[in-house]
Curated annotation (Swiss-Prot):
<dbReference type="Pfam" id="PF11490">
    <property type="entry name" value="DNA_pol3_a_NII"/>
</dbReference>
<dbReference type="InterPro" id="IPR036397">
    <property type="entry name" value="RNaseH_sf"/>
</dbReference>
<dbReference type="InterPro" id="IPR003141">
    <property type="entry name" value="Pol/His_phosphatase_N"/>
</dbReference>
<dbReference type="Pfam" id="PF14579">
    <property type="entry name" value="HHH_6"/>
</dbReference>
<dbReference type="GO" id="GO:0005737">
    <property type="term" value="C:cytoplasm"/>
</dbReference>
<dbReference type="InterPro" id="IPR029460">
    <property type="entry name" value="DNAPol_HHH"/>
</dbReference>
<dbReference type="InterPro" id="IPR044923">
    <property type="entry name" value="PolC_middle_finger_sf"/>
</dbReference>
<dbReference type="InterPro" id="IPR012340">
    <property type="entry name" value="NA-bd_OB-fold"/>
</dbReference>
<dbReference type="InterPro" id="IPR004805">
    <property type="entry name" value="DnaE2/DnaE/PolC"/>
</dbReference>
<dbReference type="GO" id="GO:0008408">
    <property type="term" value="F:3'-5' exonuclease activity"/>
</dbReference>
<dbReference type="InterPro" id="IPR006054">
    <property type="entry name" value="DnaQ"/>
</dbReference>
<dbReference type="GO" id="GO:0006261">
    <property type="term" value="P:DNA-templated DNA replication"/>
</dbReference>
<keyword id="KW-0548">Nucleotidyltransferase</keyword>
<comment type="function">
    <text>Required for replicative DNA synthesis. This DNA polymerase also exhibits 3' to 5' exonuclease activity.</text>
</comment>
<dbReference type="Pfam" id="PF00929">
    <property type="entry name" value="RNase_T"/>
</dbReference>
<dbReference type="Pfam" id="PF17657">
    <property type="entry name" value="DNA_pol3_finger"/>
</dbReference>
<dbReference type="InterPro" id="IPR040982">
    <property type="entry name" value="DNA_pol3_finger"/>
</dbReference>
Amino acid sequence: MTAKEEEKQERFQLLMTQIGLQDVTTYEEFTKDAKIEKLVADKKNKTWQFHLHVPQIFPAALFHMMDVGMKRAFSQIAETEMQIVPENQTINETLIQDYWNLIVEPIGKQSPMIGKLLMEQKPTFKEPHFIEVAVHNDMEEATIQQRFQTKIIESYGKAGFPRLAMKMHMLDQSETDEYKAFAQAKQEEDQKKAAEAVQVMQKRQAEGQSGGGGAAPLTGPFQIGYKIKDDEEVKRLGDIYDEERRITVQGLIFATEIRELRSGRSLLQFKITDYTSSMIIKMFSRDNEDAAMFQNLKKGMWVKVRGSVQNDTFVRDLIMMAQDVNEIAGVKRLDTAEEKRAELHLHSPMSQMDATSSVDSLFKQAADWGHKAIAITDHSVAQSFPEAYGAGQKYGLKVIFGIEANLIDDGVPIAYNDQHIALEDATYCVFDVETTGLSAVYDTIIELAGVKMKNGEIIDKFEAFIDPGHPLSATTINLTGITDDMVKGSDPIDVVLKRFKEWSGDDILVAHNASFDMGFINTAYEKVGLEKAENAVVDTLELARFLYPHFKNHRLNTLTKKFNIILEQHHRAVFDAEATAYLAWKLIKDAKEMHNIDFHDSLNDYMGEGDAYKRARPFHATIYAQTAVGLKNLFKLITMSNINYFYRVPRIPRSQLKKLREGLIIGTACSQGELFEAMMQKGMQAAEKVAEFYDFIEVQPKPVYAPLIERELVRDEKALEEILKNIVRVGEKTGKPVVATGNVHYKDPVDKIYRKILIHSQGGANPLNRAELPDVHFRTTDEMLKEFAFLGEEKAKEIVVTNANLVVDWMENLKPIKDELYTPKIDGAEDEVRNMSYAMAHQLYGEKLPEIVEARLEKELKSIIGHGFAVIYLISHKLVKKSLVDGYLVGSRGSVGSSFVATMTEITEVNPLPPHYLCPNCKDSEFFDDGSVGSGFDLPDKDCPHCGTAYQKEGQDIPFETFLGFKGDKVPDIDLNFSGDYQPVAHAYTKEIFGEDYVFRAGTIGTVAEKTAFGYVRNYERDMNMTIRGAEIDRLVAGCTGVKRTTGQHPGGIIVIPDYMDVYDFTPVQFPADATDSEWKTTHFDFHSIHDNVLKLDILGHDDPTAIRMLQDLSGIDPKTIPTDDPDVMKLFGSTESLGVKPADIDSKTGTLGIPEFGTRFVRQMLEQTKPTTFSELVQISGLSHGTDVWLGNAEELIKNKTCELPDVIGCRDDIMVFLIYQGLESSLAFKIMESVRKGKGLTDEMEEAMMANKVPLWYIESCKKIKYMFPKAHAAAYVLMAVRIAYFKVHYPLYFYATYFTVRADDFDLTSMVNGKEAVKATMKEVNDKGMEASTKEKNLLTVLEIANEMLARGFHFQKVDLYKSSADEFIIDGESLIPPFNAIPSLGTNVAKQIVAARENGEFLSKEDLQQRGKVSKTIIQYMDDQGCLEGLPDQNQLSLF
């Protein structure tokens, strides 16, 4: 064998070692003579193809092991594949079938159907080289031939097989049946094997014991099947690549599910992880006892599982069919130290996209370890404070509330060593240094160059290399272009510095980023025994930032390019110095011209003004609230950083921190803090000066600083230890306690992957992506002591334990949220609400109020006034009143309609009294309080027996308790639906009422959702060139969800701060999503956190009031006069008769398309089944459709089985209380039952007994048990009232209805179909319907619009084309029996452009399409669309100039 051939064999053996298969002796006969013939590398596509020369085709298992091993080993470098070239190409059916699953498995990802077909069979082999597979039909055959046949043949070819041909065999009926039987048998066999594998745990307990439905009580660790021996080999999940028989794995359960099968058995499915990967485990129950035992398997358990790994065609992944499952002791880190530390630097998921472990899990861990306290220090925010306080109470921990702030100096100096030197006459020594690193203390200068400039001309030069005495690092060489050869043998640094100091003399020193260059020069001067430079200094970087703040950046190469200054070789001192000199002269002239700066000591006159905070470089500092005053000051600082000093991140100027320092403790934070940086770059003296500002000094474990070493900002671990030792010495010298903190971002080391995925999702925008992330898990006392062992045992304990607890003891116990509700005060609010209520009651019910009216008023007013809620009613009244005066109705949401006082103060139109007649003339009334009538609107028409006037009909029979609770002390939540058009006006009105400093939008916190996290994980998998099992993806997704991603504002929530307090008593303030141009500020805390402490007004935007206003404008009809029992309107909810069309015409058996709450397919089906004829029944429908488990599987079955009728079923939560009181239950118990049922808690035994004792039907009791959530009746009644009014117009004024619907509710149109008539609309509807689930959201929305359009066309109306001179910008216009669409109905034409067209039209006719495009600001695409639709007939393409 030649040397070259031997080398090829050695390369192959090296490859086997690299991929971890060097010890695979089973396949030695296949690998011993194997060679790497060549490696084809495609740099562009990052692929490597290994051409392997082998004696014969590898067994499938060996090929697979090598393929997986190569992909793992080279995942960070390239995508790998093999091309096997065997000397012997002999093949047989067994070999082909062995490879089959490997080759066809990827097809399942592209086509699950074809993948399943191929995976469930084995090909047959026909000589010479044919393989044959079975298909059921032509479609399957065509799909395989067109999409997958070539891939299959090529895959076999890459494995070394000779060129194969592929045939398809169509199964006849008998074969199809046989195939189905085979597939069924295979499935049954799998299930049978799994069931048989669940061996007897022990002899079942004594006879007669129920195997029932409940979880069997555990008397010890969970076990199903046999005990798994402690010494049995456990395989890592990450090492499982293929099907395997009878292996054992172990891990943490992170998801469980039990499914009941049609066979009566249960399927247990759970997911485990050992943090190398994750896997789905399945197990079938053998009997009821197994099924009961399944319920004892819980998320969070550690288990050992024995079973077989197999491909699951349903999940298309490897899963394990379990035979034995044993609970085992989990892997836990323990804190065994006698004296415990306390963590003072910890991040929660509120540190935006940067920390992953929940507050609860971190606090539980601290408590389990025996720590007495813990601090929260999220990045610039306090949003975890409320949750942290609750967790502290739960686990008995003292909570220290802090933030990790971005601290800035108030303006960075442009000039140092100020001197009164005329800038135009001065001589400048412009210099630059190239160094081995960023630390003036630990690194050294390797090139020093400068030029002297006078009057803009270079008059002298200085240039010198310096021998550092050691080889240069690759980073230094790459960055500077300076090599070892260039510096070797050069003068030592003391010689060069002495020459430079003499050369520069007293001239003004100039550098770009002078603090760096001067830091190196002065530190170097000190090292060699020279005096520090006292020269006047100018920093061109800060001068450029001051003069040109709008530039994107102010790097030297950017500025020289901007000003056409030659920079020949950036990062070489001589070239940088020369370019900086010309730049400096340009800047000096601009400073004179722009700001009249003539002298060196005037350069800093503007420091800190205007946007100077944007130019300052932030550094980290930890700020803690020590006292209640400090907590308020912290809230003020957070607000200030978000409102006044936000630039990329919230910033806190040092001067503001000094002003508000009372009650605060300040720590030095992490490697991004100024103390660590000063020590790293400038040395002990600078660090001591910095330390004076702080209360204590932080140091962190060496692994936390690891990225500094990786990026060569710190030379090595020894240099890092030296920095940390020096920081400890600074603490000793200054008397500041030094505390070891963890900079915690997650709980356990295995959680690091979640943070990696989150940081990776942010791309290059996040500086953390520039190096491997450090290990920043929550460390025990033992672990922390070990990290600082290099300081000596005594000193390590001092900083880890003693000083940490010392700082804890400085802090008071604080509460970041209030205990009570603080409502605004309006003088006389109580009297005003009482007087208004009685005045309206007397106006409606007469001078002598009916007893039922007065009793209800007094009951409510006692609660409302007694608990301080009158002001809330008064505010709501003012808001509604203003809207009504301005011409917009207001709909109510939630339970406010349960309050009669709310009705009397005109907050809601819903009257909650029992159904009654009311005479508008003589005020006579007649009440029905026995439950015989569901709604006053359903009473038959009747005249007043006293004066003959037609009675008004009112009352929805809703108890007050559903609004303010049984004791009337629940904080009222008044939700109001304003017109979407009017909502901004209503919001602004709150500022008029309370003042701008006392109203804020309710803040929200947007976290990473599961779908978003899935995208992050998939992108990470792709970019890291990994293949991650499905169960592992699920685990990673779960670990990334819930992390703060952004902030926002509640769509209608307004928080009102009482004027006798200020907002900082409750929460900091910020802009939503950091949008500093936002009109509104929001609460910093999520509004749920302070919901019970301050008044929240829900001023929501809704389409119904907008639609009602448009209908009123079109018709002139006051919506309040519309009858609620119009017969033709009521028919609409059960048939299409009122519309004059047949059900087939509109594909609906009811006429409620487009009616709010009743137009969806789901509710229309309910209407078809229930056929409501009254208002109260419509309220029932509304309640049933909004509840959970109220209709489906509950009321629906009761009505279908004729157990009861629609009026009898439970529709709304209030129905329960009212019905039970009518049945004779005591009112407080009726209330408790209603509350329990509506919250999905079902009934207690005592409740059931009381209901049965009062003859409540059994079906009613069972119905209550099924319910998970219920809708308030007042909400339903308000919705139905609006719906009936809109339905009135649909029946009696159809074009008004359709014009309003398309204007207010529709966003997506197909004008081509709509204009072309009914058949065109139906054809488009069919296209969308045919897509089924594959239809896009836009297409589904369009379908709804087309259903309404189809109905309008069926009723004999039609659509015109968009008319250049008639169309509105944004409203459909009625023209005879047709509608003219607005301009914004044209695809991609927005409302602003539509308004621009109308404005241009008012200034004169359009001369041409070109004129329309220019004056109307219309794109060419829109012009083309309008032209194609015939909207621009007669309009020439371009303006024409006439000569006559």
